[in-house]
Structures are given as structure tokens and as C-alpha cells.
Amino acid sequence: MHVLTTITKITITMENKNNFDLYNEEIFNIEEEKEIENQMRDISLSGFELTSTEKTLLNTSTLVPSPSTSNLEDTGNSTVPNSTVVTVVPPNKDRKIERPNQFGDLKTTNHLTKMNSNIMQSIAEIFNAEILKFAKRVNAEYPTVPVEGMLAIWCKQQDMPLSTFEILEGKEEVYNNIDNEDDEPTQVVKKAPPKKKAKKVVKKPVEVRDDEEDVEQENGVENGADEMTSDAEDDRRSSDEEVEHAKPVKKAAAKKKSPAAKKEKEPSKECQHMYVKGKNAGTKCTTTVKGEGNYCSKHKSKAV
């Protein structure tokens, strides 16, 4: 009878067993969360060195303390001494297990999901801090690249609000339309240089003076005489070379001037015509008079 009473006290009904399983599941979830948190605290981000501030962000995610056994109450109905009989009373099925909202405004009922979200949020803050450092480093090397512009582009690409970075707070109007700007540079149309109008060159008719014609004729006669004398000399030299041990070549005969060249040149006379109009007004015609008279052939008719 004593043994039967002990078994009866320890036995749990099916209804209470369901509540007990729920309690065990809660303890299991807390232990699993603790393992995940320890793993996340030991994580090393490739390419990033965690600072003391960043480590503090990761250490802020505290776990819910496991419920103590002091909540387990003894009904006091057992007649068996406490040293031999253990009475297990599961939590009341009507009591709701309250989970404190220690993870901000994350709207979820899964405690594990809340914890993971908090850790990922801390990691995101670390990434953003590294992005800010990188932007400042680029700006130090290239002052023409603004830090705010780089951060604004980063927020747009990652679909994040500009308020993610404190440096961009209150500047939404400036950077909200950053995607609406034209990516392609404006094409600069080069204007063709104006064409220069070619000036028409009017050639003035050159007046051939009578004295120039006489000089050309005299030069032509002299050139013809020179050619004749040079041909005669060549014939003589060729005949002298045929005879061996011939006498020295005699000096060439003096050049004979043509009869036209022997003629004495008559004294030249200039035209006596005076210009009255035009650019030569007040000057006298310089054309040489050919033949008799005091006027050239051009002004002879006007002098009559």
C-alpha cells in the first residue's frame, strides 16, 4: 500500500504531461539559444577587425534566464517523507509563459527568431561602421569624392533608409533623387567653325611697255647669235681631235654680233601725257615713245 501511494504521487496525468512537455520544450529552446549565442560571439568576420564598441554590440544580446526550480510547489498531500518521495507538480496549464520583449520592436512570437534577428542587427551595424570608415578613407585620398554621396549611394543600393547613418540625417531631400540623375554624360555637340569667305582677288591688267618689247627682241637676237657661234666651235674641236699630234687648237674667233645688235639705240623718250583723274592724277605717263612724236600709242589719239 505504501509503494502504491508513492507511485500514485509520482504518476502524471495525460493532461499534465502535455504541460510538462511544453515546459521541457521551453528549457530546450533556451539551451539552444545559449549555444547559438556563444557561437556568434566567437565569430570572426573576414576582412574586419572587431573593435571594443562592436564587441559590446554583440554582447548586448542577453538570454532569458532559465526558470528556477523554486517555482515547483509541493501540494503537501503526500504522507511519504520528503527524503523518499519526490512530488512533481507541473505548471498550471492556464498560466501563460511570458517571454520578455528584450529585442526591441521585432514582431514575432518565436523566441529563437528574435534572438537571431538581434544578432544580425548587431552585425549589420558593424558592417555599416566599416562602410563609413571606408568612405572616409576614400575621401582622404580623393577629396573630390564626398563621404555623404558615397553613403547615400550605398543606402540606395541596399534599399536602406538614409537615416541609417547619422551623417545623412535631415538630408533626405538632397539625396532622395540620386537615382533620377542621368547616368550617361551629356553629349557635347561641337559646332563647326564658321567658314571664312574667300576674298576675290581682282588681277589688274599689266601694261606692256614698248621699251620692254624692244629689249626682249634684242635679247632674243643675241641669244640666237650665241647659239650659232657655240655650234661652230664644237665642229672645229671635233675635226682637230681626229688628227694625231695636231697643232694646238687656235683660239676661237671673236663672236660676231648680229647686225641688229650693232645698231645704235636711239635715245628713248617718255610720253608727255599727264593724268588728270584716277589714282595717278597729277603724274606723267612713263611709257617710252616709239617713233616720232611726244606721246605713246595709247595717248597719241588723245593728244590730237
From Swiss-Prot:
- What protein am I looking at? Uncharacterized protein 411L
Q: Where are stretches of biased composition, namely Basic and acidic residues? A: 234-247, 261-272
| UniProt biased composition (Acidic residues) | 209-233
Outline the segment boundaries, as ranges, of region: Disordered.
Answer: 61-82, 178-275
| Positions with biased composition (Polar residues) | 61-76
- Species this protein is from: Invertebrate iridescent virus 6 (IIV-6)
UniProt feature, compositional bias: Basic residues: 192-203, 248-260
Domain of life, per UniProt, equals: Viruses
